[in-house]
Protein backbone atom coordinates (compact mmCIF):
# COMPACT_ATOMS: atom_id res chain seq x y z
CA UNK A 1 0.00 0.00 0.00
CA UNK A 2 2.84 2.41 0.77
CA UNK A 3 4.19 2.24 -2.80
CA UNK A 4 0.70 2.78 -4.24
CA UNK A 5 0.06 5.76 -2.00
CA UNK A 6 3.41 7.44 -2.68
CA UNK A 7 3.66 6.63 -6.39
CA UNK A 8 2.50 10.06 -7.60
CA UNK A 9 4.19 12.24 -5.00
CA UNK A 10 1.71 11.84 -2.17
CA UNK A 11 2.85 11.14 1.36
CA UNK A 12 1.31 10.08 4.63
CA UNK A 13 1.18 12.09 7.82
CA UNK A 14 1.26 10.35 11.19
CA UNK A 15 -1.93 10.85 13.16
CA UNK A 16 -0.09 12.58 16.02
CA UNK A 17 1.57 15.03 13.55
CA UNK A 18 -1.54 15.92 11.54
CA UNK A 19 -2.42 19.29 13.06
CA UNK A 20 1.17 20.55 13.12
CA UNK A 21 1.92 19.37 9.57
CA UNK A 22 -1.29 20.78 8.06
CA UNK A 23 -0.73 24.12 9.82
CA UNK A 24 2.81 24.17 8.39
CA UNK A 25 1.53 23.38 4.88
CA UNK A 26 -1.00 26.21 5.11
CA UNK A 27 1.51 28.67 6.60
CA UNK A 28 4.02 27.84 3.85
CA UNK A 29 1.24 28.26 1.25
CA UNK A 30 1.98 24.78 -0.06
CA UNK A 31 -0.59 23.78 -2.66
CA UNK A 32 -1.87 20.44 -1.49
CA UNK A 33 -4.84 18.25 -0.78
CA UNK A 34 -5.17 16.67 2.64
CA UNK A 35 -7.20 13.47 2.57
CA UNK A 36 -8.57 11.88 5.72
CA UNK A 37 -9.52 8.24 5.66
CA UNK A 38 -12.23 8.60 8.26
CA UNK A 39 -14.52 5.60 7.93
CA UNK A 40 -13.26 3.85 11.05
CA UNK A 41 -14.61 4.08 14.57
CA UNK A 42 -12.99 6.67 16.86
CA UNK A 43 -10.79 5.55 19.73
CA UNK A 44 -12.36 5.41 23.18
CA UNK A 45 -11.12 8.89 24.17
CA UNK A 46 -12.34 10.48 20.90
CA UNK A 47 -16.05 9.71 21.15
CA UNK A 48 -17.22 13.32 20.74
CA UNK A 49 -20.14 12.93 18.33
CA UNK A 50 -22.84 10.31 17.93
CA UNK A 51 -25.38 9.96 15.12
CA UNK A 52 -27.63 7.38 13.51
CA UNK A 53 -25.44 5.70 10.88
CA UNK A 54 -26.81 2.71 8.95
CA UNK A 55 -29.63 2.50 11.52
CA UNK A 56 -27.15 2.16 14.40
CA UNK A 57 -26.18 4.62 17.13
CA UNK A 58 -22.63 5.37 15.98
CA UNK A 59 -19.68 7.45 17.07
CA UNK A 60 -18.13 9.40 14.19
CA UNK A 61 -14.65 10.93 13.93
CA UNK A 62 -14.74 14.71 14.33
CA UNK A 63 -11.05 15.45 13.70
CA UNK A 64 -11.46 16.37 10.01
CA UNK A 65 -14.22 18.87 10.88
CA UNK A 66 -12.29 20.35 13.81
CA UNK A 67 -9.19 20.87 11.64
CA UNK A 68 -11.22 22.35 8.76
CA UNK A 69 -12.94 24.78 11.15
CA UNK A 70 -9.68 25.73 12.88
CA UNK A 71 -7.86 26.50 9.60
CA UNK A 72 -10.96 27.49 7.59
CA UNK A 73 -10.21 24.89 4.92
CA UNK A 74 -12.82 23.71 2.40
CA UNK A 75 -14.17 20.19 2.87
CA UNK A 76 -14.69 17.84 -0.07
CA UNK A 77 -16.10 14.32 0.14
CA UNK A 78 -14.52 11.77 -2.19
CA UNK A 79 -16.97 9.17 -3.48
CA UNK A 80 -14.87 6.31 -4.86
CA UNK A 81 -16.44 3.83 -7.26
CA UNK A 82 -14.77 0.71 -8.60
CA UNK A 83 -15.09 0.46 -12.38
CA UNK A 84 -13.30 -2.88 -12.63
CA UNK A 85 -10.51 -4.64 -10.80
CA UNK A 86 -7.79 -2.07 -10.12
CA UNK A 87 -9.70 0.83 -11.75
CA UNK A 88 -11.65 3.46 -9.84
CA UNK A 89 -13.40 6.76 -10.45
CA UNK A 90 -13.66 9.47 -7.84
CA UNK A 91 -16.52 11.96 -7.66
CA UNK A 92 -15.71 15.02 -5.54
CA UNK A 93 -18.62 16.54 -3.65
CA UNK A 94 -18.15 19.93 -2.03
CA UNK A 95 -19.39 19.79 1.55
CA UNK A 96 -18.48 23.41 2.37
CA UNK A 97 -16.06 26.12 1.33
CA UNK A 98 -16.60 28.00 4.58
CA UNK A 99 -16.44 25.58 7.52
CA UNK A 100 -16.30 28.35 10.14
CA UNK A 101 -19.77 29.46 9.02
CA UNK A 102 -21.39 26.06 9.58
CA UNK A 103 -22.96 24.90 12.85
CA UNK A 104 -20.83 22.64 15.02
CA UNK A 105 -20.92 18.99 13.85
CA UNK A 106 -22.72 19.91 10.61
CA UNK A 107 -19.71 18.84 8.49
CA UNK A 108 -19.41 15.57 10.40
CA UNK A 109 -23.12 14.88 9.91
CA UNK A 110 -22.86 15.61 6.17
CA UNK A 111 -19.92 13.21 5.97
CA UNK A 112 -21.96 10.49 7.73
CA UNK A 113 -24.89 10.93 5.32
CA UNK A 114 -22.63 10.88 2.23
CA UNK A 115 -20.72 7.83 3.48
CA UNK A 116 -24.00 6.08 4.23
CA UNK A 117 -25.21 6.67 0.64
CA UNK A 118 -21.96 5.19 -0.72
CA UNK A 119 -22.26 2.10 1.45
CA UNK A 120 -25.94 1.54 0.63
CA UNK A 121 -25.17 1.89 -3.08
CA UNK A 122 -22.46 -0.79 -2.86
CA UNK A 123 -22.29 -2.61 0.51
CA UNK A 124 -19.60 -5.03 -0.69
CA UNK A 125 -17.22 -2.12 -1.33
CA UNK A 126 -17.02 -1.15 2.33
CA UNK A 127 -14.52 -2.81 4.62
CA UNK A 128 -16.88 -4.11 7.31
CA UNK A 129 -14.02 -5.30 9.52
CA UNK A 130 -13.45 -1.76 10.85
CA UNK A 131 -15.66 -2.67 13.85
CA UNK A 132 -17.71 0.49 13.33
CA UNK A 133 -20.00 -0.36 16.28
CA UNK A 134 -17.58 -1.64 18.90
CA UNK A 135 -18.43 1.32 21.19
CA UNK A 136 -21.91 1.67 22.63
CA UNK A 137 -23.27 4.84 24.18
CA UNK A 138 -24.67 4.32 27.65
CA UNK A 139 -27.13 6.78 29.19
CA UNK A 140 -25.06 7.22 32.36
CA UNK A 141 -22.26 8.65 30.24
CA UNK A 142 -20.10 5.57 30.67
CA UNK A 143 -18.84 3.68 27.68
CA UNK A 144 -19.47 0.01 26.98
CA UNK A 145 -17.03 -1.66 24.59
CA UNK A 146 -18.08 -4.75 22.70
CA UNK A 147 -15.43 -7.14 21.44
Feature roles, as predicted:
Residues 1-16:
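Membrane-interfacial amphipathic helices and adjacent loop/beta segments
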Residues 16-147:
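Non-catalytic C-terminal accessory region of glycerolipid acyltransferases
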